[in-house]
């Protein structure tokens, strides 16, 4: 349930970008090929994407946005407080979804058991069944190409879609322009 998609986020020098494929699967059947699994939060200042149960993910998006509002858009404080709530709440602990959230300064993976993980390099994160393919491609393209952030995310997701049966080529990308502080 956690794996049937691919979400990739890249916090580059000029832009923060998140992308995801559009495939929705149920067991071994494709139910939909053009779903949107990424969105902007907090008046377009935060990017987020999910892998896992769609209904659970929408609940998590809404709850996380409440924390962003309460913390006035401070992504670091919001993920910490959200994680605490996730771990304490019996209903939240049963949700089957993971999220990536990022802005121009930070990128985090929020896991299904309430953990918050900041990627080691602080720049690239992925979740879902094609996540390892996408992050491998993104790291290689970052190191050996001159692609801009959006093109790097699109190409990495395309490579993941070539390899992962739960990921398709209907790729959607969102970005935040802006300099890092």
Curated annotation (Swiss-Prot):
Na(+) binds at residues 161, 164, 167. Pfam families: Proteasome (PF00227). HAMAP family: HslV. A double ring-shaped homohexamer of HslV is capped on each side by a ring-shaped HslU homohexamer. The assembly of the HslU/HslV complex is dependent on binding of ATP. The gene is hslV. PANTHER family: ATP-DEPENDENT PROTEASE SUBUNIT HSLV (PTHR32194:SF0), METALLOPROTEASE TLDD (PTHR32194). One of its GO terms (cellular component) is HslUV protease complex. The keyword Magnesium does not apply. It catalyses: ATP-dependent cleavage of peptide bonds with broad specificity. Belongs to the peptidase T1B family. HslV subfamily. Keywords: Allosteric enzyme, Cytoplasm, Hydrolase, Metal-binding, Protease, Sodium, Threonine protease. Its main location: cytoplasm. This is ATP-dependent protease subunit HslV. Its EC number is 3.4.25.2. It comes from the Bacteria. GO terms for molecular function: metal ion binding; threonine-type endopeptidase activity. InterPro entries: ATP-dep_Prtase_HsIV_su (IPR022281), Ntn_hydrolases_N (IPR029055), Proteasome_sua/b (IPR001353), Proteasome_suB-type (IPR023333). It is found in: Cytoplasm. Protease subunit of a proteasome-like degradation complex believed to be a general protein degrading machinery. Allosterically activated by HslU binding. It is an enzyme of class 3 (hydrolase). GO terms for biological process: proteolysis involved in protein catabolic process. The active site is at residue 5.
């Amino acid at each position: 349930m956690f794996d049937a998609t691919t979400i990739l986020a890249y916090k580059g020098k000029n832009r923060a970008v998140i992308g995801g494929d559009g495939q929705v699967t149920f067991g071994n059947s494709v139910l939909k090929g053009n779903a949107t699994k990424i969105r902007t939060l907090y008046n377009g200042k935060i990017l987020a994407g999910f892998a896992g149960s769609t209904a659970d993910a929408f609940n998590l998006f809404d709850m996380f946005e409440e924390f962003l509002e309460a913390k006035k858009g401070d992504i670091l404080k919001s993920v910490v407080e959200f994680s605490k709530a996730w771990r304490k709440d019996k209903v939240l602990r049963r949700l089957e979804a993971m999220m990536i959230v990022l802005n121009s300064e930070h990128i985090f993976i929020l896991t299904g058991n309430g953990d918050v993980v900041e990627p080691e390099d602080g720049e690239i994160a992925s979740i879902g069944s094609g996540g390892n393919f996408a992050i491998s491609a993104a790291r290689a393209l970052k190191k050996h190409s001159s692609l801009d952030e959006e093109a790097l995310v699109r190409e990495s997701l395309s490579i993941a879609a070539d390899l992962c049966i739960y990921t398709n080529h209907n790729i959607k990308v969102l970005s935040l322009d802006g300099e890092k502080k």
